[in-house]
Amino acid sequence: SCTSKKDSNIQATIDSLSIYDNHSTLEISEAKHLQWVDSVLGVKGVKLIDYRNGIYQYDDTRFYWNRTFGYFLVYPSSFTHGKESDLGNGNHFVNEDSTICLNVYATYFDVFKDDYSLREWFDMMIDSEIEQGYRITKKDITDHSYTIEGNTKGGRCFYSKATCKKTYERDIILTVKLEYTDSKKEEARAIICLYNNDKIIAKELH
């Protein structure tokens, strides 16, 4: 499982608060929606997989489009997508036997800018991972992002990348986290290469 019992309890609480459920149904025809998607992305032939959960496909590329925070995440088409969080900030994806779990989520950073520098905020995020039992063996911090790798409390490998980006005129921090068993290291490295090459995109939408 990709979530701890604590996370599940939090999710159950959020689930009971329907005020937070900001997912709209598709009120125009699918064809009209896809015409708009094509125009936004500058391509032709995007297919809709799951509107509520933001899943689309272009050729053989499956991607998650988070409309609330304006970012895209390319992920392996063989993975099963989950439900977009009720806060609308992310989603999760798993391979067939759940030996690889992929999570992506966004948070607003600009609301904290008066109190913390980005570096201080990154340090707090990393400290939070350590407090949750993650053992970090590799850490790389730049002016606008950090990458950490290591092992989870349960003995899985993990990779996490957080990047500060601007979208809808807001500063957000976008986090991608991958947890995988040692036997799936090769497959996981291929996915990690995608995100190291920035196949996670925050795009200004109008």
Predicted regions and their residues:
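Bacterial signal peptide processing site
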Residues: T3-K5
